[in-house]
Amino acid sequence: MIIDIGNSRAKVVVMDGDTLVKEYAAEEFSASLFAEIMEAYPAISRAIIASTRGDEEVVKSIVAQRIDRVIIFKPAT
């Protein structure tokens, strides 16, 4: 799972190796969006979070409830 939090919207991509499986887009990344994705793809075990907003720790707190392996890219990265 790749989560890209931009200035105007959040995009989430589900990958299987090098293959893009599904794309999601919303104004905000939320616990309900994450739950929807995890319900559809319960085998997801890794996530990358990138944010230009500086809210990556909030997103991580949602994601870390179900996924242990999380990499974060912050605005300064």
Feature roles, as predicted:
Residues M1-V21:
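Gly/Thr-rich phosphate-binding beta-strand-loop-beta motif of the actin/hexokinase/Hsp70
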Residues S61-T77:
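Glycine/small-residue-rich loop that forms an oxyanion/phosphate-binding "nest" at active or ligand-binding sites
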Residues A43-R53, R69-F73:
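Short glycine-rich phosphate-binding loop at a beta-alpha junction
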Residues A35-R46, R66:
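Phosphate/pyrophosphate-binding loops at sites that engage ATP/ADP/AMP, CoA/4′-phosphopantetheine
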Residues K11, E57-V59:
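Phosphate- and divalent-cation-binding pockets in alpha/beta enzyme and binding domains
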Residues F29-S32, A40-P42, P75-T77:
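Short, surface-exposed, polar/charged, turn-prone segments marking secondary-structure boundaries
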Residues K22, E27, A47-E57:
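N-terminal beta-alpha supersecondary unit
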Residues V14-E36:
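Basic/polar, acidic-poor N-terminal "presequence/leader" segments
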